[in-house]
Amino acid sequence: MVRVTVPATSANMGSGYDSIGIALELYNMIDLAENDHIDISDKNGQYVPQDESNLIYQCAKRVYDECGKPLSGLTIVEDCAIPQTRGLGSSSACTVAGIMGANMLLGEPLDRNAVIDLAATIEGHPDNSTPAILGGFCVALLENGHVHHVRVPVHGAIDFVVFIPDFQLSTEKARAALPKIIDHHDAVYNLARAALLAGSLTTGKLENLDVATGDCLHQPYRFGLIENGEDIVREAKKLGALGAFISGAGPSIVAIVYKGDRDYI
């Protein structure tokens, strides 16, 4: 049996829509072992699909298929702390767990880049799947089946605080709220801030983060789906947050704070 620990992720980070993400200290732990049948359970008694529709199983089988290996079944034991449909990369975490677990069971025929490419190809969001694999702060894009990515060190003086509401918001619904055409000015607005965000996090220019997490492409359309979302962002900043934004498609909100201010915020 192998164990895979995968972190939650926060994608977009305001200005970096579909391109920037960071791993958080909230984890799913998944145990996998080969079996002659499918045996899937959850340690906490939560409902999980117990057949071939289980995402972890599907992704594990994809690895076996890619490597030309037969798979009769798997034992999968899930211990998941990442809440589903809250904008914290729960689907990416399951995708990565299935791929990495199967790869470990097979003796790691896929190298790290192949794992990253396959996860993004299956999941469709390299800004979630890449930091889920590499950890830390990542910039990533998927092109022709290959993920071009950079893992960048983050200045050590900050923490990330996550506000997780008690309601769900599907990625499909959040994406449906977005316009099909964007204004050139809005594109430039985000491009400048995404570059500033990456540079500021890595150099410690923390005074830039409020501006750098600004966004015109997705948050203005999604706040209407998140009760009190804009109020939470405003209040977090009033209490000293350096920046705040919708995590992924929402509805969770993330605030960037100085280390030591986490409990206060």
Predicted segments with their positions:
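Glycine-rich beta-alpha junction loops
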Residues: L26, D36, G136, I164-L169, ...
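A generic local secondary-structure boundary/capping motif
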Residues: D18-G21, A120-T130, V147-P153, A198, ...
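Active-site rim beta-loop-alpha module in soluble metabolic enzymes
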Residues: I164-G224
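Short beta-strand-to-loop capping motifs
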Residues: E34, P165, A255-K259
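Gly/Ser-rich oxyanion-binding loop with an adjacent helix/lid
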Residues: P70-H148
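Glycine-rich, charge-dense phosphate/pyrophosphate-binding loop(s)
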Residues: L201-I265
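ATP-binding N-lobe of GHMP and related small-molecule kinases
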Residues: M1-R86, M100, M104, E108-L110
